[in-house]
Swiss-Prot record:
Belongs to the UreD family. PANTHER family: UREASE ACCESSORY PROTEIN D. Required for maturation of urease via the functional incorporation of the urease nickel metallocenter. It comes from the Bacteria. One of its GO terms (cellular component) is cytoplasm. Keywords: Chaperone, Cytoplasm, Nickel insertion. This is Urease accessory protein UreD. It comes from Nitrosococcus oceani (strain ATCC 19707 / BCRC 17464 / JCM 30415 / NCIMB 11848 / C-107). The keyword Cytoplasm applies.
Length: 296
C-alpha cells in the first residue's frame, strides 16, 4: 500500500470569526474583478473581463503558445487600507487553461477600526486548469484583515496555487505586534472538500514564537496542487534544497501540499518556483515557462 505522508496544518489562534459585513463601517473603496476563459479549438480565450474600482488585468499573453492564457492582475493603489474590499472571481471553462500572477506584493496597511477584506473564488468546468501564482502578501503591523479563498474544481480539472505571507516588514525590523488576520481557505472537487483551513492570528500572539506556530519566522507559505505524485516524483520534490527557512511536502488523497517557514519572502518564492518546476510537468503535463515579470 502506498504510504501517504501527513504534514500537519499550522495551528491557529482560537478566536471568533470576524464581524459580519453589516457590523462594519461603510466601505471605503470596493473593487471587483471577474475573469472567464473558454477553450476555442486549440486556444484559451478570455471571454469575460469585468471590473469595478481599482482592480484591473493587463492584456492577455500567450508566452507558451495558444493553449495557456496568462493574465497579470493589477491593483494600482498598491495597498489595501481599512474598509477596502477586493472581490476576485476567476472561472476556467472546459479544457481552458489560465495562469494568473501579479507584478508585486499585495500590502495590507494598518487600520485603527475598519476591517479590510478579500474574497477570492477560483472555479473550473471539467478539464479546466487554473494556476494562481501571485507575489507575496505583506501584512503591516496593525492591519485588520479578512481573506476568504475558495477553489471549486470540476471532474478532471486541475489547479496549482500558492500563498506567501509576510508578517510585518522583517527587513525593516517591524514585527507583527498588533493587528489581526483572519484567513479561510477551502478547496473542493465536485463539491467534496479536499482541503479546509482557518486561521485567526492576533498581533503579538504567542503563536508567532511558538514551535507549533510560526516558530519566530516572519514568512510563511502554502502551495497546493491537485493530483497525486508517484514515488519518484515525490522524492524529486522532497530533495529540492530549501534555503533561508524550512519546509515540507505531503501527498494527501488527490492533493499535494507544501509548507514553508522562513526569514524572507524571496526564499519562499524560490522554493515554490522550484517545486512548481517539478509539479507542473508531473501533474499538468507541461514544462514551466517563468513569467517575465518575475525577473524584473
Amino acid at each position: 500500500m502506498k504510504k501517504i505522508a501527513v504534514f500537519k496544518q499550522m495551528p491557529c489562534e482560537a478566536a471568533d470569526a470576524p464581524p459580519a459585513k453589516t457590523d462594519l463601517l461603510p466601505l471605503s473603496w470596493p473593487a471587483k474583478l471577474e475573469l472567464g476563459y473558454q477553450r476555442v479549438k486549440m486556444r484559451t480565450v478570455p471571454v469575460l473581463r469585468r471590473h469595478q474600482g481599482p482592480l484591473r488585468v493587463q492584456k492577455h499573453l500567450y508566452p507558451e503558445g495558444p493553449a495557456v492564457c496568462q493574465h497579470m492582475i493589477l491593483h494600482p493603489p498598491g495597498g489595501i487600507a481599512g474598509g477596502d474590499t477586493l472581490d476576485i472571481q476567476i472561472h476556467a471553462g472546459s479544457h481552458a487553461w489560465a495562469q494568473l500572477t501579479s507584478p508585486g506584493a499585495a500590502k495590507w496597511y494598518r487600520s485603527e477600526v475598519s476591517l479590510a477584506r478579500q474574497n477570492l473564488a477560483l472555479s473550473t468546468e471539467p478539464g479546466g486548469i487554473l494556476e494562481w501564482l501571485p507575489q507575496e502578501t505583506i501584512f503591516f503591523a496593525g492591519c485588520q484583515t479578512a481573506l476568504d479563498t475558495t477553489i471549486d474544481l470540476a471532474e478532471d480539472a486541475k489547479v496549482i496555487a500558492w500563498d506567501i505571507i509576510a508578517l510585518g516588514r522583517p527587513a525593516s525590523g517591524e514585527r507583527f505586534n498588533s493587528g489581526r488576520i483572519y484567513q479561510r481557505f477551502r478547496l473542493r472537487r465536485n463539491g467534496r472538500l479536499l482541503w479546509s483551513e482557518r486561521m485567526q492570528l492576533l498581533g503579538g500572539s504567542r503563536l508567532l514564537e511558538s514551535p507549533i506556530g510560526f516558530a519566530g519566522y516572519p514568512v510563511a507559505g502554502t502551495l497546493l496542487a491537485s493530483g497525486e505524485l508517484n514515488d519518484q516524483q515525490l522524492t524529486a520534490c522532497r530533495s529540492l534544497p530549501i534555503e533561508g527557512g524550512r519546509g515540507g511536502l505531503s501527498q494527501l488523497p488527490g492533493l499535494v501540499v507544501a509548507r514553508f517557514l522562513g526569514e524572507e519572502t524571496e526564499a519562499a518564492r524560490n522554493w515554490f518556483i522550484a517545486l512548481w518546476q517539478e509539479l507542473r510537468p508531473a501533474l499538468l503535463g507541461r514544462s514551466v515557462s517563468i513569467p517575465r515579470i518575475w525577473n524584473t
